[in-house]
Amino acid sequence: MLFLGFSSGLPLLLIFATLSLWLREAGVDRAEVTYFSWAALAYSFKFVWAPLIDKLPVPLLASRLGQRRGWLLLAQVAVVGAIVLMAQSDPGTAAGLQWMVVAAVMLGFSSATQDIVIDAYRIEAVEKELQAMMASTYVAGYRLGMLMAGAVALYLAAGFGTTKEVYVYEAWKWTYF
């Protein structure tokens, strides 16, 4: 459960905190940064598609892995794909900024979906007596993921050569990889 918590905490700060700094260093206009608020909507409205995830099986995966694990695998592949797309998108260019918006929205949606599945899986995986331990282990992993996406990511970006004064796309690219 620690690793599932980590995989939930990591995307949150990659979208909201670390990305804002990256965009500012790339010289993205504040008006254009507002497009990235679409990524946050997925977290706010995940209750809308949560019942679908409970009811609909993922073709091919559900029969092999089960309902929850099938959705979890699909969501995690989408999270990784979105992070890779973000790493490949230079927001310092117009086309790169558009792809960055797409990747951030994709990351928000897939991460919110992953949160839905992990919460359901955590509740169903163990007996009631172990729920508190599972929840605390999940939260510890979540916090570690947030730490990695926040402070560690900024440390890496600086280590790869980007600063407030000098924008280095390659530094951010390797940080997100």
PLM regions and their residue ranges:
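Helix-loop boundary and gating motifs at the non-cytosolic
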Residues: 1-43
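Short helix-loop-helix connector
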Residues: 23, 27-28, 57, 117, ...
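Cytoplasmic helix-loop-helix junction between adjacent transmembrane helices
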Residues: 106-141
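Central cavity-lining transmembrane alpha-helices of secondary-active solute carriers
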Residues: 32-59, 79-80
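Glycine-rich segments within core transmembrane alpha-helices of 12-TM secondary carriers
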Residues: 42-49, 132-158
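C-terminal ends and interior cores of transmembrane alpha-helices
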Residues: 58-59, 70-94
